């Protein structure tokens, strides 16, 4: 049986191997054709595998790494001192063809810089963007990018993000002629920073992009657009704010009806409502769409939330599997030359 092999930065994230190792076992249990290379401290990793199913361990290999890139390290310094780190070795496994994709919950800036340096961007792409696919109110999906890879973006980068997001929505999500919008502080054409207005001018005159104009942050989950484009600073703040509100909403649902002074029938009604609402809105749980693809590279790199729990990191692993199976870089590369506006 041919296995799909992924490299995991087992030491990255807020909880390191205490999350990545059990998440890896969960992913292996759910996918019999998956093999994982766990990069990190062998002693720490193996101590967490003592009670693991021996059959799962046959598809798991520990790759030693002496060092870890700290989550608060400056990207430039982290990249210079990256030799021997779990993140860099995981990326090297992809570069050398030993793994089909890399998954890391580590330092976003360092991951971006190392991936660009080692795996290289596709032709026509200046800088990769972090992209995720989130559910919306129309029971459909919305592609959102950039989510933090590039804090500052010029108009050219925003246009490139729009192209990549459009290709992703059509080729991978399966949306015909996807609508593309720029995230802005208003829908009027005069609103926004110069780079946003300049990008809008280009997208309006790009016939292969179904550009619909500006949308605001409160439109992110409405389904008004299939692709939402913004710079990494705005995207990161927007996504995390949205996730925080959703988590609060779900936690309030969970705690409702649990008061000690309530009668049994009120508690029963409360629990019934919880199940109904959870079924209706459970798909919005951020854990279910953890894992942002570093879009625009020649290989596949998935960035998990640093604070991801076991369930969420397992979802990020599954995101990597799907990206490999759907040949995301190849599909984007195949359409970039025809779609991307030519630069002077």
Swiss-Prot record:
One of its GO terms (biological process) is phospholipid biosynthetic process. The keyword Lipid metabolism applies. GO terms for cellular component: cytoplasm. Its EC number is 2.3.1.274. It comes from the Bacteria. Its main location: cytoplasm. It catalyses: a fatty acyl-[ACP] + phosphate = an acyl phosphate + holo-[ACP]. Pathway: Lipid metabolism; phospholipid metabolism. GO terms for molecular function: phosphate:acyl-[acyl carrier protein] acyltransferase activity. It is found in: Cytoplasm. Keywords: Cytoplasm, Lipid biosynthesis, Lipid metabolism, Phospholipid biosynthesis, Phospholipid metabolism, Transferase. SUPFAM superfamilies: Isocitrate/Isopropylmalate dehydrogenase-like. InterPro entries: FA_synthesis, Phospholipid_synth_PlsX-like. Homodimer. Probably interacts with PlsY. Catalyzes the reversible formation of acyl-phosphate (acyl-PO(4)) from acyl-[acyl-carrier-protein] (acyl-ACP). This enzyme utilizes acyl-ACP as fatty acyl donor, but not acyl-CoA. Belongs to the PlsX family. HAMAP family: PlsX (MF_00019). This is Phosphate acyltransferase. The gene is plsX.
């Amino acid at each position: 049986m041919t296995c799909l092999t992924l490299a995991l930065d087992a030491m990255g994230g807020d909880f390191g191997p205490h999350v990545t190792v059990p998440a890896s076992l969960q992913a292996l249990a759910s996918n019999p054709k998956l093999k994982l290379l766990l990069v990190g401290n062998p002693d720490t990793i193996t101590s967490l595998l003592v009670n693991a199913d021996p059959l799962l361990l046959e598809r798991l290999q520990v790759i030693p790494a002496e060092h870890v890139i700290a989550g608060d390290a400056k990207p430039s310094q982290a990249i210079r001192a990256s030799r021997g780190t779990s993140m860099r070795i995981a990326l090297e496994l992809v570069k050398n063809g030993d793994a089909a994709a890399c998954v890391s919950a580590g330092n976003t800036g360092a991951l971006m810089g190392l991936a660009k340096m080692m795996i290289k961007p596709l032709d026509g792409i200046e800088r990769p963007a972090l992209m995720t696919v989130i559910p919306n109110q129309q029971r459909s999906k919305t592609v959102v990018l950039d989510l933090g890879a590039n804090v500052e973006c010029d108009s050219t980068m925003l246009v490139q993000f729009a192209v990549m997001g459009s290709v992703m929505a059509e080729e991978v999500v399966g949306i015909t002629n996807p609508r593309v919008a720029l995230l802005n502080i208003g829908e009027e054409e005069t609103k926004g920073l110069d780079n946003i207005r300049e990008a809008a001018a280009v997208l309006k005159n790009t016939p292969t992009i179904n550009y619909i104009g500006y949308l605001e942050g409160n439109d992110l989950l409405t389904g008004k657009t299939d692709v939402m484009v913004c710079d990494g600073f705005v995207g990161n703040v927007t996504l995390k704010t949205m996730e925080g509100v959703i988590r609060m909403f779900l936690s309030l649902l969970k705690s409702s009806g649990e008061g000690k002074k309530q009668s049994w029938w009120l508690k029963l009604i409360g629990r019934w409502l919880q199940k109904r609402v959870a079924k209706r809105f459970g798909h919005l749980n951020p854990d279910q769409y953890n894992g942002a693809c570093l879009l625009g590279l020649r290989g596949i790199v998935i960035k998990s939330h640093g604070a991801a729990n076991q369930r969420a990191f397992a979802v990020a692993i599954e995101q990597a599997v799907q990206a490999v199976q759907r040949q995301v870089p190849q599909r984007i590369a195949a359409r970039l030359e025809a779609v991307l506006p030519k630069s002077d």
